[in-house]
Amino acid sequence: MGIANKLRLSSSSLSRILHRRILYSSAVRSFTTSEGHRPTIVHKQGLDILHDPWFNKGTAFTMTERNRLDLRGLLPPNVMDSEQQIFRFMTDLKRLEEQARDGPSDPNALAKWRILNRLHDRNETMYYKVLINNIEEYAPIVYTPTVGLVCQNYSGLFRRPRGMYFSAEDRGEMMSMVYNWPAEQVDMIVVTDGSRILGLGDLGVHGIGIAVGKLDLYVAAAGINPQRVLPVMIDVGTNNEKLRNDPMYLGLQQRRLEDDDYIDVIDEFMEAVYTRWPHVIVQFEDFQSKWAFKLLQRYRCTYRMFNDDVQGTAGVAIAGLLGAVRAQGRPMIDFPKMKIVVAGAGSAGIGVLNAARKTMARMLGNTETAFDSAQSQFWVVDAQGLITEGRENIDPEAQPFARKTKEMERQGLKEGATLVEVVREVKPDVLLGLSAVGGLFSKEVLEAMKGSTSTRPAIFAMSNPTKNAECTPQDAFSILGENMIFASGSPFKNVEFGNGHVGHCNQGNNMYLFPGIGLGTLLSGAPIVSDGMLQAASECLAAYMSEEEVLEGIIYPPISRIRDITKRIAAAVIKEAIEEDLVEGYREMDAREIQKLDEEGLMEYVENNMWNPEYPTLVYKDD
């Protein structure tokens, strides 16, 4: 009886065997004709073969092999032979060491990244336990600022593929390609097209590193199960001529698709992933401004998605701005009275402006007058200077924040006024940098901030990576004194004043918010990520610090508390989803059960659904 059972095959197993025999016979004919040798028979497909050091060829798998072995989408699109692979490895290794000295302030950052990456390859549970237990030390290694250097040198660092690659050449194939990913359930996708990686510009297919790093933080901070995350690169080409002309570049060596051709690729990708994983949350990351806003508006009311550059950066900045209000000893409701000069009108800058306007307007009653009043608190300066209604060909996204020409004339300003001129005349409470221009807040600009009408002015140098920060904390504190508030997008060390006092360098990292937004959306079952859910996340972060901490100039908590911060933000997001009647349930918890949870119950619900890196007991079961 036992032998009979072993010999009995299911119809699906028989179909797979017959299919493989057909592929084998065709492979024999093909290989024998063209290369004069028989193929090696393998019993693995997809990621299994990529993770087998004996059979893995990496980028040398031909397109025929990729289709035959279910590898399509699991490798960068450019096919290379072994000689090209060796040349790429040696060339990029040397280039990598040369560029490392211009990278993060920690000269060992790249070496640490490599060691962590090797651990990730060997033992995922141990990797995340190390990351969680040392999050303050290693978050800057797996994410900003080190990840910027990783992306710049991705082809040299590429060893084992992570995530999926969808390219312009895969049009019409994506619906089947998603099934090459082995996970039956995916909770979180981070997707990029590589067009605007941090402040480094168009890095093409190398941008996959930012998606990998972001998802590491989803696992470490939010407890998303690492078997249910998927980093994705959508390769539509690159306008980076240096990359495009590099024979060792791993991506498509063509200019970026534009207009409807571009939209068609993204549409097909979204339809494919939501067909296979209907409940997945997709975070868009580092898309250039013109597409970041268009895609957000195109998908946000249909899919569970958000854009971290537009909405996440905005949320963290709002939390910091509200913290700056508290640091002045004022209630957060005074936020609409703050005068803010914003340097930068890209996706991040406009995202912050929109979020700040909505927050102010809500505090003022959400009337049309409230929106007008809120809008009047911002002065936006881009590469061409102050944006006013007199500007020609103004970006539609920046249009609502263009100042009235006559009003500016009364203030002694005009279209194109410099940042220094604007700061001198406006005397703002806050100078907010989202320009990606390192050193933009020059000595002259910071000197002008001395005229601020605020009792405790704030400097937010939020651009990443470190070299793109508008100024350093040392620059700001040395000119404005120890009473100011400082925040940045990249990590800096606190400034010692020599009198026992410390200038706190608050890092306004997006990792404070996006893990909680993602986790809260996931556990609520909300079909969309609403503005209210995003605002709830910001206000939760702003209220996290104690009064004593805020008065000391600490407006963001230490990264070491990230699991607790994320848990509270996720609970706040779920609570807002309940109030907006967006809750649809998660797994065994239906909507009615979630709606009954009080604040303590929500916290417990979130904590119980956060993955922890512990070794499970394994039991073998024969198929």
Swiss-Prot record:
A divalent metal cation binds at E285, D286, D309. The record marks D309 as: Important for activity. It is an enzyme of class 1 (oxidoreductase). Optimum pH is 6.4 for homodimer and 6.5 for NAD-MEH heterodimer. In the presence of coenzyme A (CoA), optimum pH is 6.8 for NAD-MEH heterodimer. The record marks R122 as: Required for fumarate-mediated allosteric activation. Divalent metal cations. Prefers magnesium or manganese. It catalyses: (S)-malate + NAD(+) = pyruvate + CO2 + NADH. InterPro entries: Aminoacid_DH-like_N_sf, Malic_enzyme_CS, Malic_N_dom, Malic_N_dom_sf, Malic_NAD-bd, Malic_OxRdtase, NAD(P)-bd_dom_sf. It holds the Pfam family Malic_M. GO terms for biological process: malate metabolic process. One of its GO terms (molecular function) is cobalt ion binding. Activated by oxaloacetate (OAA), 2-ketoglutarate, succinate and fumarate as homodimer and by OAA, 2-ketoglutarate, succinate, fumarate and coenzyme A (acetyl-CoA and CoA) as heterodimer NAD-MEH. NAD(+) binds at R196, D309, N464. GO terms for cellular component: mitochondrion. Involved in the regulation of sugars and amino acids metabolisms during the night period. This is NAD-dependent malic enzyme 1, mitochondrial.
